Amino acid sequence: MDTKSEFLWIEKVVGSRRFSNVFWALVVLLGALGFILVGLSSYLNKDIISFLPSQSITFTPQGLVMCFYGIGGFFLSLYLWFAILWDVGSGYNEFDRCEGVISIFRWGFPGKNRRIRIRFLVEDVQSIRLELKDNLSSRGLISIRLKNQQDVPLTQQKDSLNLSEMEEKAAQLARFLRVPIEGF
């Protein structure tokens, strides 16, 4: 939920807890378990699950390779589930005109740099930059261009805004911060 007043604008950023991430983590987990079960079935020379026949698969080398693929897929799935659990990439963008500070906060993986916070002054902002990529997916990116020519991205590539919403959001932010907008 976004909060907006005359001097303060806080927008929430969605991280890894998206339906698509849960879907793909589940697909990878089920696929990995299927590979492991078929590999183990070929080792035992007996079908563990009836709809995954393994009688025609010899353990060496096919069953062994399937076990390795299953273990690799299981660890990839584990990584995806932990990223979802920790909500990596979520956070907020805070624009405070009263104090003259912009604060960008994101959650990372556990460890020394779990909390990622970038703060800079509003007076250091040169412009709001809107970069549009006109390809099949027609994605855009909103970023803050600082006076030292450094760009700080505000939106993620996977955000589901269409181009007109992206332009409107960039224009609102430029009006709020009272800086120009540049785009290409």
From Swiss-Prot:
TM helices/strands, residue ranges: 22-42, 64-84
Pfam family, one: Ycf4
Membrane protein topology class: Multi-pass membrane protein
Localization, UniProt: Plastid, Chloroplast thylakoid membrane
UniProt xrefs under PANTHER family: PHOTOSYSTEM I ASSEMBLY PROTEIN YCF4, PTHR33288
Family of the protein in this entry: Belongs to the Ycf4 family.
Protein name (record): Photosystem I assembly protein Ycf4
Organism placement in taxonomy: Eukaryota, Viridiplantae, Streptophyta, Zygnematophyceae, Zygnematophycidae
